[in-house]
């Protein structure tokens, strides 16, 4: 496989893999794998037992028996506890039901298995300003076309806090909240950082539950991190509990 086929997001995921402590020949599901299945092929070249899955069957041309046609909004076609890791790049934002997807991933992961998700970072400062002005986040400059439903529509964009809640409710524990890449234009929005710092400090203090206050400290630290303020895409690494 030509490494030039990898997107900047897929490259970031691939570079992060050594830090995840996966065994050689670990079984990894890449879902959705996309029409060119570039990440699935790269995983195989790195020695992993990689399976690609997508609603678009064209990936079968490149993956052969290592491809499974699957609707990620439905029950996944694998038995329980079969994968060591699942990688989902730029997929969850296209799904109708995050919870059913995450619970299915939880089901097919082995105990202690790893889930890596990337998704547009609508928590980023640039995206927040776009929403303030237009009512739409950075990835969608105008309303979705209601007359022509498309699998690539961003129907499930979510903030970091929402994704954290969904993951924890689905049986995962977030280990890392990273970014895949940063565009230089994002630094122009640094002027808003002091306001965000002060606003979250005041807002989060209103929580009365001591256990949630502890969790809110984690959430606020993430919200004020370089990755969430400036990253184009989130990369969340979570572990099956």
Predicted regions and their residues:
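Conserved N-terminal segment of class I S-adenosyl-L-methionine
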Residues: 1-79, 85-89, 99-102, 156-160, ...
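Conserved phosphate-binding and hydrolysis motifs of nucleotide-dependent enzymes
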Residues: 84, 112-113
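S-adenosyl-L-methionine-dependent methyltransferase catalytic module, highlighting the catalytic core
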Residues: 4-6, 96-104, 108, 114-239
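Short catalytic micro-motifs in class I SAM-dependent methyltransferases
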Residues: 90-94
């Amino acid at each position: 496989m030509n490494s030039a086929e990898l997107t900047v997001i897929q490259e970031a995921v691939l570079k992060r893999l050594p830090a995840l402590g996966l065994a050689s020949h670990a079984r990894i599901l890449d879902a959705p794998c996309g029409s060119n299945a570039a990440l699935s092929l790269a995983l195989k070249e790195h020695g992993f037992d990689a399976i690609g899955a997508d609603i678009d069957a064209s990936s079968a041309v490149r993956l052969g028996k290592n491809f499974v046609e699957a609707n990620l909004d439905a029950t996944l076609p694998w038995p329980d506890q079969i994968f060591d890791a699942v990688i989902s790049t730029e997929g969850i934002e296209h799904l109708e039901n995050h919870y059913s997807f995450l619970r299915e991933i939880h089901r097919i992961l082995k105990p202690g298995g790893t889930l890596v998700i990337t998704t547009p970072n609508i928590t980023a400062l640039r995206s927040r300003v776009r929403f303030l002005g237009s009512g739409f986040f950075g990835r969608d400059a105008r309303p979705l076309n209601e007359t022509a439903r498309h699998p690539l529509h961003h129907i499930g964009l979510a903030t970091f806090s929402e994704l954290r809640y969904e993951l924890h409710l689905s049986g995962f524990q977030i280990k890392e909240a990273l970014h895949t890449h940063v565009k230089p234009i994002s630094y122009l929005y640094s002027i808003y950082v002091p306001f965000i710092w002060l606003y979250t400090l005041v807002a989060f203090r209103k929580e009365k539950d001591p256990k949630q206050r502890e969790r809110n400290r984690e959430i606020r630290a993430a919200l004020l991190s370089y990755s969430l303020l400036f990253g184009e895409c989130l990369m969340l690494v979570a572990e099956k509990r």
